[in-house]
From Swiss-Prot:
Origin species: Salinispora tropica (strain ATCC BAA-916 / DSM 44818 / JCM 13857 / NBRC 105044 / CNB-440)
Protein name per its UniProtKB record: NADH-quinone oxidoreductase subunit K
Keyword set, alphabetical order: Cell membrane, Membrane, NAD, Quinone, Translocase, Transmembrane, Transmembrane helix, Transport
Biological role: NDH-1 shuttles electrons from NADH, via FMN and iron-sulfur (Fe-S) centers, to quinones in the respiratory chain. The immediate electron acceptor for the enzyme in this species is believed to be a menaquinone. Couples the redox reaction to proton translocation (for every two electrons transferred, four hydrogen ions are translocated across the cytoplasmic membrane), and thus conserves the redox energy in a proton gradient.
Subcellular location: Cell membrane
EC number: 7.1.1.-
Annotated family: Belongs to the complex I subunit 4L family.
Superkingdom assignment: Bacteria
Catalytic class of the enzyme: translocase
Disulphide bridges, residue numbers: none
Amino acid sequence: MNEFFSVEPNYYLVLAAVLFTIGAAGVLVRRNAIVLFMCVELMLNAANLTLVTFSRINGDLNGQIMAFFVMVVAAAEVVVGLAIIMAIYRTRRSASVDDANLLKY
């Protein structure tokens, strides 16, 4: 019964590649800072999925531990990034990344 529910690791790697591609396309195309952060998070989740998949293939926990640390760093990145976005929005009334260079004035 367990073999019926098991999924090949190749499918996880393909899913991770698709998620990373969607995130990279969003980073390249979009100008809204909040959408950029969401796309970067999507790319980090794709990297985490790849780490966990290779951890499962090799049978060790190192990839899962690394994915955990990536999630912790990503959470800290979101906190700092959203604080910067809020500062930009308060001064410029826009969340566009084009206004980010105006924050120094």
